Amino acid sequence: MEPNSLRTKVPAFLSDLGKATLRGIRKCPRCGTYNGTRGLSCKNKTCGTIFRYGARKQPSVEAVKIITGSDLQVYSVRQRDRGPDYRCFVELGVSETTIQTVDGTIITQLSSGRCYVPSCLKAATQGVVENQCQHIKLAVNCQAEATPLTLKSSVLNAMQASPETKQTIWQLATEPTGPLVQRITKNILVVKCKASQKHSLGYLHTSFVQKISAKSLPERRFFCSCQTLKSHKSNASKDEVAQRCIHFFACICAFASDETLAQEFSDFLNFDSSGLKEIIVPQLGCHSESTVSACESTASKSKKRRKDEVSGAQRNSSPLPQDAVSSNLRKSGLKKPVVASSLKRQACGQLLDEAQVTLSFQDWLASVTERIHQTMHYQFDGKPEPLVFHIPQSFFDALQQRISIGSAKKRLPNSTTAFVRKDALPLGTFSKYTWHITNILQVKQILDTPEMPLEITRSFIQNRDGTYELFKCPKVEVESIAETYGRIEKQPVLRPLELKTFLKVGNTSPDQKEPTPFIIEWIPDILPQSKIGELRIKFEYGHHRNGHVAEYQDHRPALDQPLELAPLTTITFP
């Protein structure tokens, strides 16, 4: 019997099944691989599309505490009777009550709560419900806290939105009432808003949901409690797209400011009909140079199409065709000068490969340490100006890794502030992250390099004119001659007047209450296209005189003092 007949032969009990169907399987919308309907992700390893997350839910999702930045306790609580995506706000507080007794008046504190579900509010005002509602009970037992999401000013500036929208988002982000966007669950977020009659707490819920179907295109749905439910499908009208609320753009900026979130919500960020490609372009590093090189390698039609796609992203700075022309001019202009420059180099006998000229992170860090050494001079007071460095983002990532040494997780900054620079270049809105180091050993661990170890103290000697210069104690190897000539009494070593400076980090005196910090400030994206940020180092140092702490005294000679010249004499020549 032939092998084909074996394949086509069907058992008798399966002969009446009829035509095969696709029941129980579905096609991946990205790669087209067939997967089971119960599968959580695509079995194609190169695709890795996640269809849905596991049904197992954490108990903390029922109630989540919101970060408000004040004593106000606000909770996001799930409404069990409506569904998993319906949530409400609950406010908890403490009220004082006086009780008159025989012994006197007793003041007690009672915990009070207010649920903002319309039915609960109505029942509370009418006095129908005597006990607490189920939402307040969930908030009282809550132990989970929302996850704050960062927002980068560079992403906000690159977003294709009106200036009023950007200004409103930045004003909400810089208010001291907690983060702008906080994540409650996988799909639900809490966004700050302007307090109104509908949202009296100044917060509202938003949700991002994506439904994948084998028969139709993926359906992306965004819902905000400030408006009615809208389904943003691929065939959504332009009017619906244009009517997005400000809270949608705030969430999109938060997604684009984080690599993990940008990958998770990439379907919303890369949604063609929404014009959101401009938002994610600066975050993923798709600069104009890489876009131009990709366009040059394709046909003219694809080149024109790609220019049209990214022209909106470059509208605020410079149009892409100009960038393409300038880059082409640079490339074409580099061909002839290279020959001339190579001839000049050969004539001079100096051949230097520019590609081999590099600066490692440790070499740069050694220069930072050396500059700190130069700043710790005895001749000046112990409060120098901040040291400013402009470095690439990769250098700061390596420095932040040194800051986090010794801890299991990445050390977060002590403070994060946003500011608007109007009186100096570059202009715009920036974020500043500040770390306070109060352990001198940790400072040394951060700045030590094999080429330049950090010197916590520096020795100086005083000159006759009142100035100071660095004193390096010579290292002399002393031979042991006591065995040959017997014991020799050790004479005390004659040392000059001991003048030292020392880094002030932590508590340097017994009566000091607050430790002196070694401050590291980082402002990313000062040069957004080059990915260059600004690093500021602030520190203080003290003065030692013969082992004792001495107050700084300005011994520098005054510039207006007359120079003492020897009297002129008459010289006679024979």
Swiss-Prot record:
Pfam families: zf-tcix
Chain segments carrying region Disordered: 297-327
Cystines in this chain: none
Cited InterPro entries: C2orf42, Zf-tcix
Entry's Gene Ontology cellular component terms: nucleoplasm
Domain of life per record: Eukaryota
Protein name: Uncharacterized protein C2orf42 homolog
